[in-house]
Amino acid sequence: MNSLPPAEGLAAVIAEAMYQVVHAAQFGRARDALIGQYSARKREEAASPLVRHGAKYFSQNDEDGILLEILRRLGLASGVFAELGVGNGLENNSLILLMHGWKGIWLGGEALAFEVPARGPLHFQQAWITRENCRALVAQGLAALDQQHVDVLSVDVDGNDLYVLRELLAARYSPRVVVVEYNGKFPPPVRWTMPYDPEHIWDGTDYSGASLQALADMLQEFGYRLVACNLTGSNAFFVRVADAGKFADVPADVGALFMKAEYIVMHPGHQTSPKTIASFLATQA
């Protein structure tokens, strides 16, 4: 039978363990402080003033605050959104709009972490999104809500984003705001797009999506201009050229607005509970 160590030896082990715990906590606080300082400096130095409004409520990073400021400038207090690629529904770009009284469509291949009431402001359809079916899926969602147009369109399908977005714009959906994930590995003027693959599943590498320049070029063909990229270099925000006057303080150069991929610059905050979203939707049904 193993014998217990002497009391003084056990005390030393406990003291060392406590030291390591305290040291780890101090290191964590110091790390968070440095990240916070770096993020604040990066936000202030951003070419687009919209980035300084960045804030995380339900988005993955700071997209919520940027989107709300864009909508404020456009004078859009309510409307209709369509988001393609919503994960389990707990973290995306349009949940904040739902909280502000908007109606909208969610499409994605993953089941939601909560139930969506049959009658309410949100229509969800679980489906694998491709270039071939995205038009029909959005049309079905709008019909379910008895709506005819989309004010905010967000696309994050982890691969075929440019192709799906181009298909929807070609279908004459002309949202006031487009939010789309870009590949922050490729700075402008690099033009790169993943070859179209309707069966593509993101493997966690940089083989995904399209460069910011490729997306900006495509969206320009449909009358849109870039106004911001979020702090982590994940999502780009576009508005109609007709609304450019409301963003006169934003430079037109895509390279100046580009944010490289830096996912460490945002603190995750409190995790969203499915109960929070479910309880809100229950009040809207």
Residues covered by each model-derived region:
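Conserved acidic-Pro-Pro-aromatic motif
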Residues: V80-E83, I96, V116, L122, ...
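Membrane-proximal basic amphipathic "stem/tether" segments
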Residues: M1-V51, A285
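Short amphipathic alpha-helical segments, especially helix-boundary/capping motifs
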Residues: S39-A46, E69, P188-T193
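Short, functional N-terminal and low-complexity linear motifs
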Residues: A30-Y38, G104-W106, E181-F186
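General secondary-structure edge motif
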Residues: A46-L50, A77, E199
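SAM cofactor-binding core of SAM-dependent methyltransferases
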Residues: V51-A144, Q148-V155, G184-P187, G269
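Short, hydrophobic/amphipathic alpha-helical patches that form generic packing surfaces
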Residues: D32-A33, E69, I96, M218
